[in-house]
Amino acid sequence: MVRRSALLWCVLILALFAVSAGCMSAPATPSPATPAMTASPATTAAAAHASVADQLASVKSDNLVWKSAYRMFSTMKSTEYVHPPYTVDEANGTYKFDCLGFADHALMDADMAAYTAIGKGANPSIETYAAYFSRLSTTTPDAAGWTKVAHPVDLAPGDICLWLKPGTLDTGHMWIITGTPAINPKRSDEALVRILDSTGTPHSDDSRTGAADRTGLGSGILGMMVDSGGNPIGLYWEGGTSTGAGEKDTTIVCGRLSK
């Protein structure tokens, strides 16, 4: 009995370590709908990536977080979704991190003071980001230049968003906005927006779908479920195609750095 108990404790500790090391790669209950392909996978993947790259290249924004995130994407040669320790080699275009690692590196490169303000000098967790963003004003920037964006339709390139379920082992997810949100004409409770993130599960119209590096840094369409007041209440992981929303009972909050 003692040996069996010890084994169970070891398994539990390893499981706790795995989920606490970084963000989850996708919500717990995604409901994807896979479109039929009419061309070869390689041709389709190359065309999709080129289309996404063109969309990102056309973004007009002076936001420092956006510029930092886009620089990583545009210079990327190799990427992978991994928990710490991360590998970030800008000279060779290698980016291996999870969603938190991506957001951290983009923000540190954009404005180190704004990054350190969140964790008060320590490396922030997703919970730390959530607590910090939740306290922000939606109108007046704090000393570090941060405001909260309350409604998904008001998001802009460079805004940082996250979801998590406090008090659970679910470590949530983080992403950076890269486009202008638009309400799905077929589903009025869904704000569709292009994002950059690091994940193991691509979104819709995603640069990682069929690519050589299918996990890690990339861009796709996320759907943010909103209530009648425009507040975020859930996520459609594959924006516009997921048949149902997940993460309905979680914290979903976004912050904007204005400098």
How would you name each of these model-derived features?
Residues T29-T44:
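Extracellular mucin-like PTS domains
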